Amino acid sequence: MSEERHEDHHRDVENKLNLNGKDDINGNTSISIEVPDGGYGWFILLAFILYNFSTWGANSGYAIYLAHYLENNTFAGGSKLDYASIGGLAFSCGLFFAPVITWLYHIFSIQFIIGLGILFQGAALLLAAFSVTLWEIYLTQGVLIGFGLAFIFIPSVTLIPLWFRNKRSLASGIGTAGSGLGGIVFNLGMQSILQKRGVKWALIAQCIICTSLSTIALMLTRTTHQGLRQHKRSYKFELLDYDVLSNFAVWLLFGFVSFAMLGYVVLLYSLSDFTVSLGYTSKQGSYVSCMVSVGSLLGRPIVGHIADKYGSLTVGMILHLVMAILCWAMWIPCKNLATAIAFGLLVGSIMGTIWPTIASIVTRIVGLQKLPGTFGSTWIFMAAFALVAPIIGLELRSTDTNGNDYYRTAIFVGFAYFGVSLCQWLLRGFIIARDEIAVREAYSADQNELHLNVKLSHMSKCLFRYKQLPRRV
């Protein structure tokens, strides 16, 4: 690795792995990991696309089932809160066990844990197809699918950093765009099957598609042997890390991911039923949900590229503020299908900004050494707020107004994204202030800098800094 790369102060922390094996400031030897930066990494990127297609992409298709269940009262005794809760469980329940899943794939292997996830997801969809009571749907389309998603996604998200260094956010953006492609397929395809053959065959078809593609991705999955071996030796399972949990920046991280999940999940699960509430059909509602997926397919790679160039927090702060404005200025007055489709396409391109940037931001805050444990805690916060988000979205719906039944939901989602932008703005100021201290004291950007003391006055001065930054942020 050339000396210029180590000296380039504009290089993002995601693009820095200390290759010299020197001791860090705490006396710990840094991990020497070779990153191929291509080669077989392109097959890994393809696998990551397929994993996202089969997990988050398939999960976004639940909006179609939700609208169908609400419209047809499919299961006796099922209320809108029940179906919303099932969607929340599918999205989040497995993520509550993220630290345990992280520990398991370090004990066994990434491939083994992902394989378990594929089995969980396939069994869940197949059993859901033959479910006839509400509690069976809770367990299959809710809990078991949630565990399948978590067992596949949490290990797979670590693959890109092992194979790519330069333009890592771009690679993550391309990979997470797979969820957008999946959303298109599952929103349109499952809606068509559901109308022609019913819920049972829609779930069976989804089972076949997800299991087949995830299995292909699993066969492509490899880890760089040196990186995996070093990482296993260095990994220490810590459910609660005082150094992490006592840091102000980490709680700003927890704040913005919590707000992001409230906005993201409520919006994702509401647009199809919102379109139906305007007087359109379920099929037309699926078109709007599909536009969200089209937007994410096109937008996430672009967001990743821009984040590599200007900084993940800077880009995220701006885009989440734009999201808030779109919800207030476009969703609230929306009265027709054309506006709903345009809104879906616009918000779809930026509402998932968290996915291509989260790894870069977490690493920026805690460094490589504390990354696994911090990610585990972060997933728990995301899971907690994603669990209640669908319920909040439906409860805010009003049926006694003339016009937009979801105007209160739109206001709520707008404030959720405003909260994301605010937390990222504060976090950005904190990181800039800490970077100034770290650069002055000659610390490498990939080291654990949680111990550096940032005064509130110093942070406040950095909130409006946009030029001559010590590092890209």
UniProtKB/Swiss-Prot annotation:
Gene3D superfamilies in alphabetical order: MFS general substrate transporter like domains
Topological domains annotated Extracellular: 59-83, 136-141, 187-200, 269-286, 333-342, 395-408
Cytoplasmic side: 1-37, 106-111, 164-169, 221-243, 305-312, 363-370, 434-473
GO cellular component: plasma membrane
Keyword Glycoprotein part of the UniProt annotation: yes
Residues listed as glycosylation sites in the UniProt record: 72
Coiled-coil stretches: none
Topology versus the membrane: Multi-pass membrane protein
Transmembrane segments: 38-58, 84-105, 112-135, 142-163, 170-186, 201-220, 244-268, 287-304, 313-332, 343-362, 371-394, 409-433
Compartment(s) where it occurs, according to its Swiss-Prot or TrEMBL record: Membrane
InterPro entries, per database record: MFS (IPR011701), MFS_trans_sf (IPR036259), Proton-linked_MCT (IPR050327)
Keywords on record: Glycoprotein, Membrane, Symport, Transmembrane, Transmembrane helix, Transport
GO molecular function, one term: symporter activity
Superkingdom of the organism of origin: Eukaryota
PANTHER family in the record: MONOCARBOXYLATE TRANSPORTER (PTHR11360), TRANSPORTER MCH2-RELATED (PTHR11360:SF315)
Family: Belongs to the major facilitator superfamily. Monocarboxylate porter (TC 2.A.1.13) family.
Function: Probable transporter. Does not act in the transport of monocarboxylic acids across the plasma membrane.
Protein name (database record): Probable transporter MCH2
Organism for this UniProt entry: Saccharomyces cerevisiae (strain ATCC 204508 / S288c) (Baker's yeast)
